[in-house]
């Protein structure tokens, strides 16, 4: 990536004028199309999040702890989209004002301190919350008795841990790093933080992959446990709680897996682009970077999945309750007939 070098902060400050490739990419029609495309995705996220939050609040089918975690995950996704929207609007205005001046079309990195900080923080926080959702399902499976009584406390603890870890990662990545130099957009990290930034991105990829694998494992164990309960336990409450655990884990597995898919897409696409960078113009490189931002797609998928999976859970829950009610009635009548036959 041409804009990142091994230069010192003092040397980066002298590079006021951007390269011809970056200048062309900023003024490209494809960059303007990307603005429209991203704005549509972000406003769609806001609209669908309203619907998802309403169904979560009014028709909750999850434990209180899972509900809280899903709400916070939804809130963080919207905050990340909101700050991304602000960054992109600033970017668009900046391009229009400075479209003819290659020495003004880039942002001085200190100008991006606040919005880039919030954007980076909420991006890492989304991974922390996905991990929290995974551990929520893990606790529900292996500490079910304690979890049922303390699911809210468990959620608050997991959220607190997510925030603390995110703060530590953020300080480790950006703490004490000079914001010298110029960047095409405020989504770009400070140039002198690139090495640590890449390490963190790679770590996030593997963490989400681990979350995905663990959630699938918990889901399979839940399904296995549910089948055993159906065969050997006839207490309606126990059977229903087992069914609820499977439903909730399926929903959360969908969210985690989808985030992994989008991050994988973003990471793989970026790796391919960097491999081909030598034979690619700088203009094309920087335009492509704008289209492979997995975060904006992942954020959109969260309200979509919460809304669809919650409604699906409501329908399955209703069918299960009807089935269990009918089954209970059949068992009761069968036992009554056996008692009558025994007495006679």
UniProtKB/Swiss-Prot annotation:
The gene is sra-27. It comes from Caenorhabditis elegans. It is a multi-pass membrane protein. Belongs to the nematode receptor-like protein sra family. InterPro entries: 7TM_GPCR_serpentine_rcpt_Sra, GPCR_Rhodpsn. Keywords: Membrane, Transmembrane, Transmembrane helix. One of its GO terms (biological process) is sensory perception of chemical stimulus. This is Serpentine receptor class alpha-27. It holds the Pfam family 7TM_GPCR_Sra. It is found in: Membrane. Its main location: membrane. One of its GO terms (cellular component) is membrane. GO terms for molecular function: G protein-coupled receptor activity. The chain crosses the membrane at residues 28-48, 67-87, 128-148, 157-177, 203-223, 252-272, 287-307. It comes from the Eukaryota.
């Amino acid at each position: 990536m041409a804009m990142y070098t091994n230069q010192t902060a003092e040397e980066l400050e002298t590079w006021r004028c951007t390269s011809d490739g970056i200048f062309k990419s900023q003024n490209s029609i494809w960059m303007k199309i990307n603005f429209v495309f991203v704005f549509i995705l972000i406003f769609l996220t806001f609209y669908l999040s309203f619907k998802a939050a309403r169904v979560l609040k009014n028709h909750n089918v999850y434990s209180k702890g899972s509900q809280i975690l899903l709400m916070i995950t939804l809130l963080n996704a919207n905050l990340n989209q909101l700050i991304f929207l602000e960054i992109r609007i600033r970017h668009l205005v900046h391009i229009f004002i400075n479209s003819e001046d290659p020495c003004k079309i880039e942002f001085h990195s200190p100008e991006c301190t606040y919005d880039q900080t919030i954007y980076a923080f909420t991006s890492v926080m989304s991974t922390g919350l996905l991990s929290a959702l995974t551990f929520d399902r893990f606790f529900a499976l292996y500490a079910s008795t304690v979890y049922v009584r303390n699911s809210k406390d468990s959620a608050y603890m997991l959220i607190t841990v997510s925030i603390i870890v995110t703060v530590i990662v953020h300080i480790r990545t950006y703490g004490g790093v000079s914001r010298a130099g110029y960047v095409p957009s405020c989504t770009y990290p400070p140039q002198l933080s690139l090495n640590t930034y890449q390490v963190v991105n790679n770590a996030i990829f593997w963490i989400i992959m681990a979350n995905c694998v663990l959630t699938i494992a918990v889901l399979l164990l839940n399904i296995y446990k549910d089948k055993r309960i159906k065969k050997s336990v006839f207490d309606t409450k126990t059977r229903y709680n087992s069914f609820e655990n499977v439903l909730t884990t399926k929903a959360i597995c969908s969210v985690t897996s989808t985030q992994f898919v989008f991050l994988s897409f973003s990471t793989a696409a970026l790796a391919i682009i960097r491999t081909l960078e030598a034979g690619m113009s700088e203009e094309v490189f920087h335009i492509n970077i704008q289209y492979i931002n997995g975060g904006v797609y992942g954020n959109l998928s969260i309200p979509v999945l919460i809304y669809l999976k919650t409604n699906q859970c409501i329908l399955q829950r209703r069918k299960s309750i009807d089935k269990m009610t009918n089954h209970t009635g059949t068992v009761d009548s069968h036992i009554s007939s056996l008692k009558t036959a025994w007495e006679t």
